[in-house]
Curated annotation (Swiss-Prot):
Sequence motif PRPP-binding, location on chain: 93-105
Protein name as catalogued: Bifunctional protein PyrR
Keyword vocabulary terms for this entry: Glycosyltransferase, RNA-binding, Transcription, Transcription regulation, Transcription termination, Transferase
Top enzyme category: transferase
């Protein structure tokens, strides 16, 4: 098994800053935007984007935490640990996750969102898009496109959970 670091902490910070600038440029009314991080690492990325938006625009956008497990089609979990302190009906919700792969987690996140309200618009921001979609889902904001083979694995580490920021690719062969 071979592990290779492909994104270090500095590059990750730049990618998050780039996503933040794109959010500012593409959303005319930022006061209608709600950030929704997908547990676990997507929540921490959402908080960083929220912090950068505050630094750049002086806005304190609401942020929620989406638990996709109860909405997945490949597992059965009853407990839903979603935290959404704002009504998302009529809001522009930006889903935020660490890796976009098959699209199944995003589908589950959208199912969770519509159970909470009816957003005006839903868009997707991901740190890494690795390809290999099984569903017709694409990211609106991408930090890094990293094409992989289907046997490789992308591992995102964030300092809040893992003690460091980095993205690695693992080749099991």
């Amino acid at each position: 098994m071979k592990t290779k670091e492909i994104v270090d902490d500095v590059t990750m910070k730049r990618a998050i800053t780039r996503i933040t600038y794109e959010i500012i440029e593409r959303n005319k009314q930022l006061d209608n935007v709600v950030l929704a991080g997908i547990k676990t690492r997507g929540v921490f990325l959402a908080r960083r984007i929220q912090e950068r938006l505050h630094q750049l625009e002086g806005l304190d956008l609401p942020i929620g935490e989406l638990d996709t497990k109860p909405f997945r089609d490949d597992m059965r979990v009853e407990e839903d640990t979603t935290l959404m302190s704002v009504d998302i009906t009529g809001k522009d919700v930006i889903l935020i996750d660490d890796v976009l792969y098959t699209g199944r987690t995003i589908r589950a996140a959208i199912d969770n969102l519509v159970s909470l309200g009816r957003p005006a618009r839903v868009s997707l921001a991901v740190l890494v898009d690795r390809g290999h979609r099984e569903l017709p889902i694409r990211a609106d904001y991408v930090g890094k496109n990293i094409p992989t083979s289907s046997v490789e694995e992308i591992v995102v580490e964030v300092v809040e959970v893992d003690g460091r920021d980095r993205v690695s690719i693992i080749d099991p062969t």
